[in-house]
């Protein structure tokens, strides 16, 4: 596999290189059309009611495109692809790797070599898959997208030189169309199979189904075909429609329709003499035409296209390969325009889906088929989106419902007629089974799958409810009190394996019910969290989106079922605070609260929860505040230091699937920028000294000027820090002795706080050990190498770290906002990082006799290792962001005083020499201040005994 994969990569790169050169050497294929749309004579298909309002226009130079495409047909079809460019609905050009995907049996293809079909995979967008048809009349395309709308392209101008590219927004409601296929007389027991929904995957085979396609005279005339001499015009139209039909079938079902050569015998050109009379008679008339003109042994499925009448009828369900009625399916639009995306997908794929074995999937009418599993009108191919009184949307999506896929798979498994080709180049995805869960009522939840693909194809995931309805009409829509049947609409596959229930906008609005999609009926709610006990059955469909290649390979699917049990004995589980537009300052402590409501028992049994933070209004939750905390309804958290007016909190069950998100945005702010010895809170280190002889602090503050304050007693040790989280350094001292203590003068309220901690010989090591933005009082006890901390947020810690003779060092070396435990041992640093407190980080940096001066010199939020060597006045720095720095700045006897004196977020080097400050600011160079006595202690200097 490794060698094969690398061969693919080499081949792929070669193809890209060769094709790119070929494209650049040719005339430009696509150009933006700059004409006024009012001046363009449009193709008659543009007149259809479902033609989109929003689209992009491009002019096509078709000859070089045709040359590229035809380089990989016939004998080259399986050997190599080509690379082409196509415009998208955003107005950009994309690259596709393209293979031939003929819809004609070889004899028919040989007769009409100018009519071709191709499949492709996106190179610009790896999730994109392409279906393209080409003929002398031009091209049509369909691009399947992921996490955005599918796209179509078709001729816009009458001369077919200008093309419209648009996103799928089909509106069937304006057209009086209905499928009249009835559920009676099934040729295969689709009901019992649908109810079981046993986990199945694609079989690793391509099924090629022989299609006999007929049409009446009105259809042929629409495409300007009036006699057998014009047969190519009709075949080109068939080809365009079947290309799109195959796009859906190949992706979901691994089925490919091939038009048989005998199709030309059932194409009719004169409406007055063709065998088709009234719409209600077409099914039987078509079957007779197929039997007499083609013969039952020569085709597997037969279908007929009309141009008007507004209806479709498969004539049967699951009758493919059954001689009695396999040739009785019909499709005819109401607007006399039998082409375009709505005709191809909403009508033709729907009716052929019946013939393959699929029933209707809607629940507005309960047909009792076992697959009435969609809310209201339904939205997948076998639904009725846009044509009921319970429309969940005005148009369908381009996938089969999981229940219908299961029906068709089971039906074809019992049939011998499709030609099956075992694939060696593609295999079904490998899917991990998803366990079930019991959840509380009225509480959001999420289902997550996990799958891999043997060939590395880009996988997509689709979660769907698979409960048969027991209601109909207005009772078929989603409702919190609905105890059975569908409550969750199907959505298009996504690249994410997770689906949240309900959709995120509903959750963020604090609602339990998702209203109808734009254009749907007001009554047709599409999602509802259950407020009653019930069972929900879900199926995950994973698609590998592999393109069809010349009958040898196509897309594969894999499935997993799971059961979610909703119990009214618990819930709702709900975040209660923050739930309004409050403001929480970064690095402050606040309580997150939630209603537990019986979720620790009652079969839900969630003992712990995870708390996460979002700064983008709940779209993502990248910040985990508490990885695990008891499910007790309240937790004090440290607010992330992030500026956001759209913050949200998420509390989610551990070991279960339910969660809740706070209902309203709230505001968080950045924690104040903390520079050492910043007494006025302006983000700059202030020139300041402590005079031990009289316990007086002298300050030159950059914004408030000179200040002084006597605090403490002679012999006390300065231990300045921000003890009240106001962004300003507080005056504080450590009183050594047998009953040592700390005394703090808080700048926020001018109060004094005294804390007893320490004994003779202890070294004060003030720092923010719990990361709450407040300095904690702490001592290092050299007698037993223990760090003793009283945390501002509550609690104490006692950690043994170090050896006799070590020098304790204070710093945040991993940038997590918490002070790490660190010691310096004769040139060796040992750091126990708070983010990884298992094995200490050991680094040799320095010599015995060096003075440690850790600080954030590169401004990355992490303190850097640094020593100042008195013997030569050199600073030796290891930047945490990478690299080293060396500075000759100082003399023997100088005291290193690093700090951010210019407020640029980077600590500057500096020395204190007999009352004179020599600072080398990173923004403006040398600054010298005469302030203090030679016996004073610069407060910027970390205390060292």
Where are these regions (language model features)?
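Propeptide (latency) domains of metzincin metalloproteases
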Residues: 27-217, 256
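Fold-level signature of zinc-dependent metallopeptidase catalytic domains
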Residues: 27-40, 162-320
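Exoplasmic/lumenal beta-rich domain surfaces
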Residues: 258, 462-532, 603, 610-612, ...
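The catalytic-center signature of Zn2+-dependent metalloproteases
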Residues: 260-282, 322-398, 464, 468-479
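Proline/serine/threonine-rich low-complexity linkers at boundaries of modular beta-sandwich domains
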Residues: 412-430, 564-572
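Proline-centered linker/hinge motifs at extracellular inter-domain junctions
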Residues: 426-430, 434-435, 459, 540, ...
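Extracellular acidic, Ser/Thr/Pro-rich low-complexity tracts
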Residues: 450-455, 467, 544, 595-602
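Trp/Gly-enriched beta-strand/coil motifs that build multi-repeat beta-propeller-like domains
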Residues: 671-945
